[in-house]
Regions:
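Long, distal/terminal scaffolding or interaction modules
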Residues: 1-277
Length: 277
């Protein structure tokens, strides 16, 4: 029988299904007192990649940017010093005490041993405001990023140049406001596209060039909202759209999003997978 409980954190009601109780009994754990949403927040709070704080470096005493809040009882070292040979984490070693719970000892050790102020690797040139990143040059507010150059406001990106305001890009250049775009060039306001060039307001394209508002196209060129055009007609229509205007961009983006809703949505994003759901 399902049971409704009140979350001790957000105070909203949530339901525990009969199958859930069976699972808790099997795992020999009590039923949750927090709702699923609050439990998810609690799990995710361990990893902070996008919030930066100004805190004192434990070695130099100077201010530095860090992914660790100032109030956290942890010592941080600037990344290059942390990687260096001037200190040794083994110096903080202690004997294990079998009379004290493991996690209490682990917590105490974690609070004593300095950690990196920001998580980064390789060269970081003019990219102080980035975290969980490596091999960046002239990057600003890029997170979970690797091999990025002349870009800003990116999350979960690899090998990207001259791109802004996007999430999950790989092997891209000159992209703006894109999500899940791979191996593409000059792609704007688009979602789930790969191997594309000069694409605007599109979704689910593969190997396409010069498309506006396309959905689920393969190997197409000079398409406007899934209608094929001649090269001359397409270029004239594109020139008449005045894409330098913010009002025009907002209008066409809304039209494209409404157009997207008319097409089936892929239930699963993945390739070369076996027995996966």
């Amino acid at each position: 029988m399902e049971e409704t409980r009140n979350c001790q954190n957000c105070k909203k009601d949530f339901t525990i299904e009969p199958d859930d109780f069976g699972f808790y009994e099997k795992m020999n754990v009590p039923a949750p007192t927090w709702c699923p949403e609050c439990r998810m927040v609690r799990r995710l709070v361990w990893r902070n990649e996008r919030n930066l704080f100004r805190r004192k470096d434990a070695h130099t005493g100077k201010d530095s940017f860090s992914g660790i809040p100032v109030e956290a009882p942890i010592q941080t070292y600037e990344t290059s010093f942390w990687y260096g040979d001037e200190w040794d984490a083994l110096d903080y070693g202690v004997d294990y005490d079998f009379s004290v719970p493991f996690f209490k000892q682990f917590q105490d050790l974690f609070h004593r041993v300095p950690i990196m102020a920001k998580s980064s690797a390789g060269f970081m040139i003019n990219s102080d405001y980035c975290n969980e990143a490596g091999r960046l040059k002239n990057a600003y507010l890029c997170f979970d990023a690797d091999f990025i150059e002349d870009s800003a406001y990116l999350v979960k990106v690899t090998n990207v140049k001259n791109s802004f305001d996007s999430h999950e890009l790989v092997d891209d250049e000159l992209c703006y406001e894109c999500v899940m775009v791979y191996k593409s060039y000059q792609t704007f306001f688009s979602l789930d596209c790969e191997n594309c060039v000069d694409v605007w307001f599109s979704k689910g394209l593969r190997g396409c060039t010069n498309c506006v508002g396309g959905v689920n196209l393969r190997g197409k060129s000079y398409d406007f909202f899934n209608e094929p055009r001649t090269k001359e007609d397409y270029e004239k229509k594109l020139a008449d759209m005045d894409l330098k205007s913010h009002a025009t961009i907002s209008r066409i983006r809304a039209e494209a999003f409404a157009f997207w809703q008319k097409f089936p949505v892929k239930y699963y994003h993945g390739i070369r997978n076996l027995n996966c759901t």
